[in-house]
């Protein structure tokens, strides 16, 4: 019997574009900062926390001396015990609330870079060393403010969670000083790119699922996974942000209350009885958009979108999906399963063959092995040359090398990277369409005395996994 915990109250939702593949101008016009569900909420039972919470005018009213934080050096793939507590002295002093410091004494405010229902985001520069940060200003009076600060403290230290550097408290608001992700938002990149190659999508998606899995292990449900809340660093790596709707959850508990963004919300949220698997559904919607360029569930109104989420059957066999590999479609089908108990977990997503095949580790292994072959071939040729010829060749080789002191973006190696991604995608689709008879399949999948080395599947646990996946 699962214990049920109600969410705070029906939260704000954002209106998202239905089609990510149309022109940039029309796509931009589809965005609105926030789309309120207050009218819709009146038709629903207004939910409140079952836990007794004192007045939220200041963090000083809460239990002093205790806060939450992750275990030091915890791996995202190793269970952490869900929500370990530590003394507040173990948390960075600058991120503790109730300090007397004034933000104007430490930072200079710059331009506004974002605005939402609960506050605004501005660039701020450190007076001490000139480093730029993002400052999120949140008005007091909403419990989401206190919860967001606590959860960011709880999750701090993970490389894919936006780092909280300092918290300043004033009479009417909190200032959260966080790392500045200069690469912008993932949604803006999606609008420009349209459809992503499977290789590129898989590497973005794996990083996202790693941080979602970490949140779930730490007893946190984000409840608002969408590309607007995924930021990019200068190197193109993702950072999960905006924990305003996030909730703490114990193992076996369920949540209630509407929260999230309409196009990404899981069907069980509409029934107001859900668990951390709502994040898996939302991530599945994002993966669908990355691979197809459009959102799966659309409508002219909230009710129409919700009706599509509850009833529309997704077709992964026609249109753009004919050029997408079967493993990718299989993963999507498992993530966008309406039956929550049948939906895979974040950890299972990370172990799916499609993720294992396309991630950096697998592809780097392919490159290293091919490089070793080419180096072996060139060394054989050098052995047959005179010492003078070897010296000339080595000098010429050194002169050809270009210094790589300029910063590179893993998502901006443009044509060459995209060409390689396209080749891999074509090969995967071709392999997926191969039909192997059962006798041949048993011979291919069964171990032999002289197994063939599979350079492209070093991340897979067995050859049988490869046969089932492709």
Swiss-Prot record:
GO terms of molecular function: ATP binding; protein serine kinase activity; protein serine/threonine kinase activity
Active site (record annotation): 224
Residue numbers spanned by region Disordered: 377-419, 441-464
SMART domains xref list: S_TKc
The entry's keywords: ATP-binding, Kinase, Nucleotide-binding, Serine/threonine-protein kinase, Transferase
Annotated InterPro entries: CDPK_Ser/Thr_kinases (IPR050205), Kinase-like_dom_sf (IPR011009), Prot_kinase_dom (IPR000719), Protein_kinase_ATP_BS (IPR017441), Ser/Thr_kinase_AS (IPR008271)
EC code: 2.7.11.-
Skewed-composition ranges (Polar residues): 377-386, 445-464
4Fe-4S as UniProt keyword: no
Catalytic activity: L-seryl-[protein] + ATP = O-phospho-L-seryl-[protein] + ADP + H(+); L-threonyl-[protein] + ATP = O-phospho-L-threonyl-[protein] + ADP + H(+)
Annotated Basic and acidic residues bias: 387-403
Protein kinase domain ranges (all copies): 107-355
Keyword Mitochondrion: no
Pfam family, one: Pkinase
Residues binding ATP, per UniProt: 113-121, 136
UniProt family annotation: Belongs to the protein kinase superfamily. Ser/Thr protein kinase family.
Name recorded for this polypeptide: Serine/threonine-protein kinase PEPKR2
Lineage of origin: Eukaryota, Viridiplantae, Streptophyta, Embryophyta, Tracheophyta
This protein's encoding gene: PEPKR2
């Amino acid at each position: 019997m699962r214990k049920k915990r109600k969410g705070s109250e029906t939260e704000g939702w954002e209106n998202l574009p239905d089609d990510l593949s149309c022109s940039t101008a029309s796509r931009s016009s589809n965005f609105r900062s926030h789309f309120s569900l207050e009218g819709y909420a009146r038709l629903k039972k207004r939910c409140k926390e079952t836990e007794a919470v004192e007045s939220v005018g200041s963090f000083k009213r809460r239990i002093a001396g205790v806060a939450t934080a992750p275990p030091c050096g915890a791996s995202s793939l190793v269970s952490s015990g869900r929500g370990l507590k530590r003394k507040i002295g173990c948390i960075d002093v600058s991120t503790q609330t109730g300090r007397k410091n004034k933000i104007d004494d430490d930072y200079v405010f710059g331009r506004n870079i974002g605005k939402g229902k609960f506050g605004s985001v501005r660039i701020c520069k450190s007076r001490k060393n000139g480093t730029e940060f993002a400052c999120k200003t949140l008005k007091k009076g909403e419990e989401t403010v206190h919860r967001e600060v606590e959860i960011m403290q709880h999750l701090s230290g993970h490389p894919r969670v936006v780092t909280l550097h300092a918290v300043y408290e004033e009479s009417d608001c909190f200032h959260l000083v966080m790392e500045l992700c200069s690469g912008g938002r993932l949604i803006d990149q999606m609008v420009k790119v349209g459809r992503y190659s499977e290789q590129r999508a898989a590497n973005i998606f794996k990083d996202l699922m790693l941080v979602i899995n970490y949140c779930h292990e730490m007893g946190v449900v984000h409840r608002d996974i969408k590309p607007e809340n995924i930021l990019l660093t200068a190197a193109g790596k993702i950072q999960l942000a905006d924990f305003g709707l996030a909730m703490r959850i114990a193992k076996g508990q369920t949540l209630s209350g509407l929260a999230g963004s309409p196009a990404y919300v899981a069907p069980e949220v509409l029934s107001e009885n859900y668990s951390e698997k709502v994040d898996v559904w939302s991530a599945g919607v994002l993966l669908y958009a990355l691979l197809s360029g459009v959102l799966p569930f659309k409508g002219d109104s909230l009710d129409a979108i919700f009706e599509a989420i509850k009833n529309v059957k997704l077709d992964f066999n026609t249109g753009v999906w004919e050029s997408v590999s079967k493993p990718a479609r299989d993963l999507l089908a498992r993530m966008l399963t309406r039956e929550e108990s049948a939906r895979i977990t974040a950890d299972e997503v990370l172990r799916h063959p499609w993720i294992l095949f396309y991630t950096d580790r697998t592809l780097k292994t392919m490159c290293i092995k091919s490089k070793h072959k080419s180096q072996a071939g060139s060394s054989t040729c050098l052995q047959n040359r005179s010492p003078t010829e070897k010296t000339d060749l080595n000098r010429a080789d050194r002169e050809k090398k270009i210094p790589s002191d300029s910063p590179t973006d893993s998502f901006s190696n443009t044509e060459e990277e995209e060409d390689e991604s396209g080749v891999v995608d074509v090969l995967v689709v071709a392999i997926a369409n191969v039909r192997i008879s059962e006798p041949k399949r048993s011979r291919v999948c069964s171990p032999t005395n002289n197994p063939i080395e599979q350079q492209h599947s070093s991340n897979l646990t067995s050859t049988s996994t490869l046969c089932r996946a492709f």
